[in-house]
């Protein structure tokens, strides 16, 4: 079978999604091989409707039949994986719609945008008119739990840096790795207290981005990740945060951190 072009794949994906039955059949058969009775019981639809959908999928080489049992072909399996990911991405964005819609996402690489479904169990916290510091307070309380932290620091914020230094000083925070911009790094370097207690701290590793731009604030420990973003007008927003404590969410966050780490140079202590 010849390889399909991206345009052909898009058209076929759209064709699948325009039918609830076709979509349900692909997802159902992703679990295991099934016969008509299995599919009737699961989908609660008449045999004629199910058979029509199966025939359409067979014609597209997504489903095959053997001894009255239906299963996905290799192409069907790939389609199912992409379909499930697409649905989970949509769900992940929908449940935290206010967070994603109101911010600049250009700092998130395409690969992680495509895997945003891994944040589907994130907790969204937003400050309110009666509690303007709710998001920031939640963040400060969160990092107090951490023995190790990875932080992508896009802004020079004394509130955040002072809290980090406090945790380093009382030794509750044992390891800290920071990725930041050249501008933020120089601001830290020109601050005597921060230079002494942060830049020259043996428990701290700092990486400076070669491109002087960072559009997200990400913090990761072994137990949680926390994401804040910028508004579309370029201003940093500390009033909305996304906290994730799942293995999937941590994987997503660490992949994002590693992406930016590859674009950085390590600061060598004097």
Question: What residues fall within each predicted segment?
Answer:
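Amphipathic alpha-helical dimerization/coiled-coil segments
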Residues: 85-138, 148-150
């Amino acid at each position: 079978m010849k390889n399909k072009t991206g345009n052909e794949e898009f058209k076929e994906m759209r064709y699948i999604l325009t039918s609830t039955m076709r979509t349900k059949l692909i997802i159902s058969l992703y679990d295991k091989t099934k016969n008509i009775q299995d599919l009737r019981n699961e989908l609660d639809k008449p045999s004629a409707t199910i058979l029509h959908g199966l025939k359409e999928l067979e014609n597209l080489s997504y489903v095959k039949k053997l001894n009255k049992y239906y299963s996905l072909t290799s192409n069907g399996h790939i389609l199912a994986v992409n379909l499930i990911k697409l649905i989970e991405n949509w769900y992940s964005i929908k449940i935290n719609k206010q967070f994603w819609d109101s911010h600049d996402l250009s700092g998130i690489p395409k690969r992680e945008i495509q895997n945003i479904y891994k944040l589907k169990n994130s907790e969204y916290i937003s400050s309110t008119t009666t509690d303007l510091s709710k998001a920031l307070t939640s963040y400060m309380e969160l990092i107090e739990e951490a023995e190790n932290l990875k932080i992508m620091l896009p802004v020079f914020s004394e509130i955040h840096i002072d809290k980090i230094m406090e945790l380093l000083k009382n030794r509750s925070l044992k390891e800290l790795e920071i990725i930041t911009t050249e501008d933020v790094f120089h601001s830290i370097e020109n601050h005597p207290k921060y230079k002494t207690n942060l830049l020259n701290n043996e428990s701290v590793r700092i990486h400076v981005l070669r491109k002087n731009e960072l559009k997200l604030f990400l913090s990761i420990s072994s137990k949680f990740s926390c994401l804040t973003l910028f508004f579309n007008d370029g201003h940093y927003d500390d009033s909305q945060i996304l906290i994730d404590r799942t293995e999937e969410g941590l994987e997503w966050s660490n992949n994002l951190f590693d992406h930016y780490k590859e674009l950085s140079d390590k600061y060598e202590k004097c």
